[in-house]
Amino acid sequence: INSYPAKTDMLQPLMDALAKFIFRLHDAGVLHKDLNITNILYKATADGEYKFQLIDINRMDFRSHLSMNERIENMRRLSCQPTAYAYILERYAAQAATNEQTFQLRGLIARLLFEIRQRIKSNVKMML
C-alpha cells in the first residue's frame, strides 16, 4: 500500500478489502487504538479474496456504536501514501453509505492534524 499509486491495478482490490474490513470492525464497535498498516496482517486466499488479522490488540476498545467522527479519528493513523489513504477513505464511505467526498475530506484533515501534532510532540521531546 505504500507503493500506491505505482501499482494501482494490483493494490485496488487489497485496499477495497481493507476498507471493508475496517468498516466491519467499526460496525461491530471495535476501536483499535493503534490502527496502522503495520498492525494489520493480510493473506490472499485461493479465491482472490483477502483475510485480515489485527495484531497489537492490547489497545482495543469495544463500544455499542461508533459515530462517523470516531471512525474517522480511528483511521487517521493508517500509515500509507496519502493517495492510498484517500482511496481507502472513499471505499470505506461507500460501505457506510455516506457522502464519499465529505468523508474523504474529513479523514484527510484528521490525518493532517494528527501528523502535525506528532511532529510538534517529536520536536518538543528533542528540545528537552
Identify the residue ranges that each predicted region occupies.
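Conserved kinase catalytic-core helix
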Residues: 1-33, 38
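A generic structural signal for well-ordered coil/turn residues at beta-strand boundaries
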Residues: 25-26, 36, 48-51, 74
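Conserved protein kinase catalytic/activation segment
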Residues: 39-55
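Activation segment
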Residues: 34, 44, 61-63
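C-lobe/activation-segment region of protein kinase-like
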Residues: 50-126
